């Protein structure tokens, strides 16, 4: 049966993959840097993204820029919140009773860390909740947070990662895995 087909671990066709990822007009030699979302998130996905982008950056001798997934989600919130600047609390379910949490101050073209990404409990987020700030992420589904919830949709676009990475380049920020 097709359900039980063997999984193969064949080497991917990198040329085909790169051709699908990059439009024909983009040439790898034209890149100034490579950015990727460095978590928190699925370990396997993060490891794959880091390895793939590190290989490109190393071979082209260009900077590799890690961007926090939580920071990218916060940046994405500007699609829904038009009143700038604002503070947004990003909180996603991690595992067991833990949550991934960070807070950011957003303006039209910059994002500052208010609270570094960390693991917290539900009790913690109930204590820090403020009716003035905005919320994004799947850990805010409790009714008491509903009035300030931007979205519980847990995602971000490559555009958010690129925008943040571009701001780092403009600021000539040094790049580290801790973003």
Feature locations, PLM:
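Phosphate/pyrophosphate-binding loops at sites that engage ATP/ADP/AMP, CoA/4′-phosphopantetheine
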Residues: 18-33, 128-133
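DPxDG-like acidic metal-binding loop motif
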Residues: 33-69
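Oxyanion-binding and handling regions
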Residues: 9, 65-179
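Short, small-residue-biased leader/transition segments that mark boundaries at the very start
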Residues: 2-4
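Short amphipathic alpha-helical face segments that pack within enzyme cores
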Residues: 13-16, 51, 55, 72, ...
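Short, well-ordered amphipathic alpha-helical segments that serve as non-catalytic structural scaffolds
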Residues: 9-25, 70
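Short, charge-rich binding segments
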Residues: 26-27, 58, 80-81
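Residues at secondary-structure transition points
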Residues: 8-12, 43, 47, 51, ...
């Amino acid at each position: 049966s097709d359900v039980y087909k063997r999984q193969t671990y064949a080497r991917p066709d990198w040329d085909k993959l790169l051709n699908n990822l990059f439009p024909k007009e983009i040439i790898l030699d034209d890149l100034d840097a490579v950015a990727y979302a460095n978590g928190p998130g699925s370990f396997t996905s993060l490891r794959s993204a880091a390895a793939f982008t590190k290989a490109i950056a190393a071979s082209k001798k260009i900077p590799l820029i890690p961007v926090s997934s939580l920071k990218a989600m916060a940046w994405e919130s500007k699609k829904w919140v038009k009143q700038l600047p604002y503070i947004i609390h990003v909180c996603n379910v991690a595992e067991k009773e833990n949550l991934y949490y960070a807070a950011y101050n957003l303006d039209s073209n910059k994002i500052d860390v208010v609270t570094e990404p960390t693991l917290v409990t539900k009790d913690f987020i109930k204590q820090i909740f403020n009716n003035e700030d905005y919320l994004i992420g799947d850990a805010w589904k409790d009714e008491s947070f509903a009035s300030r919830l931007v979205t519980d949709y847990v995602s971000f676009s490559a555009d958010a990662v690129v925008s943040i990475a571009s701001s780092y380049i403009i600021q000539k920020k040094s790049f580290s895995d801790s973003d």
